[in-house]
């Protein structure tokens, strides 16, 4: 009887080990869901807005599709953002290799067994990044359950190839903060009119608070709810040792101060120049069949431009390492113009002054006399 019990126990244990091994193989081979290859893991974000810049480096505007993302490096991001992110989303971020067993176990017990759906999940920052980068939206609960182990494997792979700071930088560069503010650089500008390195502690906490649910904690739609969420982030920073209790109380009492200005590609500086550059850079090689009979002169001029002007059709003349042509909307190009922003500002002020003091009064006098 005892021998039979031991035999059964060992059989179950062996069966469990074999099943687990088979499941891991199935995940790594992509049999139960999409598994990115090494190249995709090493180059996870492949869509960035291109920038039009003045000769002195001032941003005139961007070209993008639905994701107006501009990459920002780790050293150009405020440390407040990193501290707030770790304190709120993954308190043991620096201690695990992609999977936090303690947080996962807590989530299973509280959410799965005790039904406490507000207890928080067990996903680490790395797992959240894996989900954002590689998991599509699940159509049902079963599909979402199958996505989880895939994200665990991807998270471990990400931890192998990136430092902790690089993982957080990828996370912040990828996240969609709504209002066409994709990535932390665009979000800092849209919500506060700043670069990521200039964000204050409360501003950083506001943006990190959105990471839980950007639609729910939208500072434009519901400022008070967003302020409360910001204060939760500040409280978490106290628990993590990044902020004193006195500072937390003082900062929590401050109102939510936004400098919100959504991106509109039809507004801003040098809009006509930006549109001209877009057309020139993305121009195709002229074909006579694409021109009407009476457009021969235009065809001739465009053909000469294609041959003699390196900028004309630049995206179609040049190829990336993979052999595909450049795309101004997704490849993160930097296009420097000959405009000097300071001289341009002086010139515009001079024109406005001349029109207001001289031309406009003369025009009014002739109009009404």
Task: Name each model feature, range by range.
Residues 6, 13-16, 24, 57, ...:
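Short, flexible segments with low predicted structural confidence
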Residues 46-244, 249, 257, 265-272, ...:
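Peptidoglycan glycan-strand catalytic modules in the bacterial/periplasmic cell-wall system
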Residues 3-4, 124, 140, 305:
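Coil-to-alpha-helix initiation sites in intrinsically disordered, low-complexity, charged segments
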Residues 21-26, 32-33, 43-45, 56-58, ...:
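N-terminal start-of-chain detector that recognizes signal peptides
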Residues 24, 71, 336:
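Short aromatic/hydrophobic contact patches that present stacked aromatics
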Residues 215-369:
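Extended, non-catalytic substrate-recognition/exosite surfaces adjacent to catalytic cores, especially
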Residues 1-53, 92, 112, 354, ...:
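N-terminal type II signal-anchor transmembrane helix
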Residues 33, 62-68, 327-331:
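Short, contiguous pre-domain boundary segments
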